[in-house]
């Protein structure tokens, strides 16, 4: 069965086709083999965690490692960061456009509460400590994160920052009456991610 392409695998293939055409076949094969091995090693992860592993974490690690065959480590990191950033900017545009609907911005903190509980909960390998959920405020301290844990486990903790930055790009400045605030992230070396999205009073 053919594996579904993710935005990371698609962008990786585009990079190698444009920049390393003579080695594109070899690099694509190396990427696919590494990703298959990573997926096999994580096959026993929960369904909830698999969502994050398959969509972003493992393709990100595979792209990062494979690109280092043809470019310096820092350039490989910035290249993968570019893939993640591009998706985040698209996501920001779509969300901001949606929030033109009058009054819709008020619902955003509540949506964050629900998505944290359903997609970013313990079953997926996260450890959220809910500090405030209601009255136009969502505040959560994330004490454990599979993005950070998996990148660290595979010897590339620096890759996690791409995903941390993605949140900031996606959610900063969505609406004049919404405040996205975060001073710490696990991926940047802190002891937690202190998430906050609130309606400006």
Could you tell me what each predicted segment is?
Residues 24, 75, 178-179:
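Secondary-structure boundary/capping signal
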Residues 136-141, 146-150, 154-201:
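C-terminal non-catalytic interaction appendages of large macromolecular assemblies
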């Amino acid at each position: 069965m053919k594996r579904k392409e993710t935005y990371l695998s698609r962008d990786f293939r585009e990079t190698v086709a444009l920049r390393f055409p003579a080695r594109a076949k070899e690099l694509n094969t190396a990427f696919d083999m590494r990703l298959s091995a990573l997926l096999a090693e994580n096959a026993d992860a929960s369904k909830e965690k698999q969502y994050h592993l398959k969509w972003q974490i493992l393709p990100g690690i595979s792209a990062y490692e494979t690109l280092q065959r043809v470019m310096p480590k820092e350039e490989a990191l910035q290249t993968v960061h570019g893939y993640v950033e591009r998706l985040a900017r698209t996501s920001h545009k779509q969300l901001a456009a949606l929030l033109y609907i009058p009054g819709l911005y008020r619902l955003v903190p509540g949506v964050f509460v629900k998505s944290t509980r359903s997609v970013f909960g313990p079953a997926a390998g996260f450890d959220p400590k809910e500090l405030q959920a209601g009255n136009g405020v969502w505040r959560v301290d994330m004490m454990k994160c599979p993005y950070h844990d998996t990148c660290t486990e595979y010897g590339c903790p620096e890759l996690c920052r791409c995903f941390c930055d993605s949140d900031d790009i996606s959610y900063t400045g969505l609406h004049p009456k919404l405040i996205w605030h975060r001073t710490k992230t696990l991926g940047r070396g802190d002891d937690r991610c202190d998430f906050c999205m609130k309606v400006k009073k």
